[in-house]
A protein has these predicted regions:
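Short Lys/Arg-enriched helix C-cap and helix-to-coil transition segments
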Residues: 64-78
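Hydrophobic positions on the alpha-helical face of helix-turn-helix-like DNA-binding modules
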Residues: 40-42, 52
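DNA major-groove recognition helix of helix-turn-helix
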Residues: 31, 56, 63, 67
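Short, Lys/Arg-enriched N-terminal segment that forms or immediately precedes the first helix
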Residues: 4-17
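Short amphipathic alpha helix immediately N-terminal
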Residues: 22-34
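Helix-turn-helix DNA-binding motif, specifically the short coil turn and the N-cap/start of the second
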Residues: 48-49
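Helix-turn-helix/homeodomain-like alpha-helical modules used for DNA recognition
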Residues: 81-107
Length: 107
């Protein structure tokens, strides 16, 4: 998986991780956010390599399905891009409001 794909999987987990089981969300976090290898996850969780791999695949599929149906990550990134573009031509007062909007999107 390419670096950008790994970044997106981490973002998907931030957005949709609450819809996964705690176990699946934790595995995604360990693999993508903490950059742990499968062997390290196996050791940490005490399950088989195949069990870890299967759980990761199911979680990845769930996350990508959620994004393809809801598109929240795509929409949020597009809103950020548009706000940053608008900020370039905005007045000082508008820039304050844009910064507030960007802060809300970061939450």
């Amino acid at each position: 998986m390419e670096k950008q794909d790994k970044l997106y999987m981490s973002i998907y987990n931030d957005f949709y991780g609450g819809l996964l089981t705690d176990y699946q969300s934790r595995l995604i976090s360990m693999y993508y956010d903490e950059d742990m290898s499968l062997a390290e996850i196996v050791k940490e969780c005490g399950i088989s390599p195949q069990g870890v791999r299967d759980a990761l695949i199911r979680a990845e599929k769930t996350l990508t399905t959620m994004e393809s149906k809801l598109g929240l990550v795509k929409k949020t990134l597009e809103m950020k891009r548009l706000l940053l573009e608008f900020e370039k031509v905005a007045t000082d007062e508008q820039k304050k409001e844009i910064k507030q909007a960007l802060a809300i999107l970061e939450e």
